[in-house]
Amino acid sequence: ALLAALPKAPSKYNPYKYPEVAKFRRNLVLQNLADNNFLSKKKSNNFKESKLDLKKRRIEIVNEANSYTEEVRRTVKDIYGFEKLYSQGLSISTPLNIDYQTQALKSLRKGIEDYDRRRGWRGPITNKLKNKNWETKVSQYKLDPTLKWNLAEIISVEDKKIKFKTIDKKQKNIEGVIPFKNLKWTLRQKKLIQNVHQKGDIFFIKKEKNLWNIKQYPKVNGGIVVLDPFSGNVLALAGGFNFKTSEFNRVTQAKRQPGSAFKPIVYAAALENGFAPNTIILDAPFVESQGVGLKNWKPENYGKKFYGPTTFRKGIEYSRNLMTVRIAKILGLPEILKLSKELNIYDEIPELLSMSLGAAETTLINLTSAYAPFVNGGKKITPTLITRIQDRRGKTIFQEKNRKCKGCDKFVNNRGELPKIENTNKKVLSEETAYQ
């Protein structure tokens, strides 16, 4: 009844601004329904006495997707300009999968934290008892709310634990304990907690698996991207550990050396040019002159070992540097560069053999999309963050043409139940005959 009363004058009868007027109009509709036998008088009177039951539309802000939405914003701004982006009421559709996004960000942060922790504890942010300006020091850290870290101060140090209290002004202060097992990584060679942690120390904490854990803000950073290899849709993207501190997107903006992640491109180019899985490549010392006055270039395998004549397949399986360089030397760098350009990894790179080991820089999103043809049967994809843009009238002004191949990513089994193969840990294929 309330909705039926609104079309005549939506602003005048706005129930949020003018509840009494809106209620009067609603009751008028209810009365008309009763007068025309669409509603009993008893029900009509009961409804008239009821209060306006309003539910505001909930606007969801997905903090986990800050990097993703910022990249979309930058893209739309580059295409349509600042004015159209912010004043024309554009509706932008993306292929973002919030579940994938949440897990991707979680995985990225865990990887960065684990790497940083392996390099040891660098000490507290500051000490409240020793530094009068401790609040200034603490205010330098701006945390993304999805981290769910608390700021804490040590109130006592014991042999097997430390007691703390949170000091975050925006949250209710709580007291708790960090057990010895969650402090071990901070101690290193120092066995006593008292040698590392002191009363008044301030640091970050987080509750994990019902136990409080000490947190260290990492000095390293990274990015992660999840692509649909069949359509190119970007399902998840996180450009860094903490968006509040740095909006720099390490997926699309940072150029890094891919290293061994580039080797499959070298091997793919070789397969396109006559190499086979059983082609024998020499895994032995390799020396290349870099010119007058420069040291010779001597690449090495991981572990600094040589394995002699080895099949092409083994080279990619074990990521052998020397075999990869020899393949590049035999094949020729122009062929590798040609495939790199086709896959949009590089535009131009110097023709140096070190490029075959991933010495040239590229972005994570370009490298990831280059792997898609290995999955989808050889189809090149373009990473897609925007699938459609509509103006304020609902007219589509942009439509992504890379339609998803329906069913291409589904596993098809026409034999009913999946076969149950007993794991006997025995090798059933001979390498000498299986790849002829």
Where is each model-derived feature located?
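Glycine-rich, acidic and aromatic/proline-enriched surface loops and short helix-turn segments
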Residues: 1-9, 73-74, 226-241, 271-275, ...
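Non-catalytic, structured segments within soluble enzyme domains
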Residues: 1-167, 327, 334-337, 341-342, ...
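Primarily short, surface-exposed interaction patches in extracytoplasmic proteins
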Residues: 17, 238, 244, 252, ...
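Active-site SXXK
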Residues: 33, 104, 159, 231-232, ...
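Conserved catalytic neighborhood of penicillin-recognizing serine enzymes
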Residues: 58-64, 230, 275-336, 380, ...
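Active-site beta-strand/loop architecture of penicillin-binding DD-peptidases
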Residues: 69-84, 90, 222-257, 268-269, ...
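A penicillin-recognizing enzyme superfamily signal
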Residues: 94, 98-101, 105-107, 135, ...
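Short active-site loop at a secondary-structure junction
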Residues: 187-194, 217-222, 245-265, 278-284, ...
